[in-house]
Amino acid sequence: AQEAIDLVRETIEALYAEKGDTAKLWGSMVKQTLKRRQPSFNESFYGFASFNELLEEAQARGQLELEMDKRSGGYVIRSVTQPS
């Protein structure tokens, strides 16, 4: 699972580098970018039923801060934190 989280973190960091640290990053945008960078990526390979489940695990491990968008039901990435 940590390998998948690392891929997500790298993708988020690349998006922040490209769009700026204040950019609003949606979970779906992160997944699309990750699939472009690694076309073979599939969260189920790492044991996650959905990409949101992967994001939730990253947050549970203290590596991401998420916010649920009430209108869309999707996640917005608030920040990437350094693994402890």
Locate the predicted segments by residue.
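N-terminal regulatory modules in eukaryotic regulatory proteins
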Residues: 1-84
